[in-house]
Amino acid sequence: MTGTGKTVTRVDLCEAVYQKVGLSRTESSAFVELVLKEITDCLEKGETVKLSSFGSFMVRKKGQRIGRNPKTGTEVPISPRRVMVFKPSAILKQRINANGAAAPTKTD
């Protein structure tokens, strides 16, 4: 996994665990799936998941509001819902910005 702007997938994470931890590919895949499932289950229950030196995943409630259809301009009600938010830790922010370079942007 390099900083080339590539999208990292579950398969990439499983391969990294396989390479760095020494578990079999099957065990690595099961490990990654278990961690992701645990994070998902906690978020579904409305719990905050805090990973030290990485960041926090949390669920926030958004109330009902009035939005606008961009094509027609008509107002439409947007129902209340829950959204997931990720807040990076200060350590992660520092590591990302350590070189002072801007993050790569997606261009067409």
UniProtKB/Swiss-Prot annotation:
Gene3D superfamilies xrefs: IHF-like DNA-binding proteins
Gene Ontology CC terms, in alphabetical order: cytosol
Keywords of this entry: DNA recombination, DNA-binding, Transcription, Transcription regulation, Translation regulation
Cross-referenced PROSITE patterns: HISTONE_LIKE (PS00045)
BP-aspect Gene Ontology terms: DNA recombination; positive regulation of metabolic process; regulation of DNA-templated transcription; regulation of translation
InterPro entries named in the record: Hist_DNA-bd (IPR000119), Histone-like_DNA-bd_CS (IPR020816), IHF-like_DNA-bd_dom_sf (IPR010992), IHF_alpha (IPR005684)
Entry GO MF terms: DNA binding; structural constituent of chromatin
Subunit-structure text: Heterodimer of an alpha and a beta chain.
HAMAP family noted in UniProt: IHF_alpha
Protein name: Integration host factor subunit alpha
Gene name of this polypeptide: ihfA
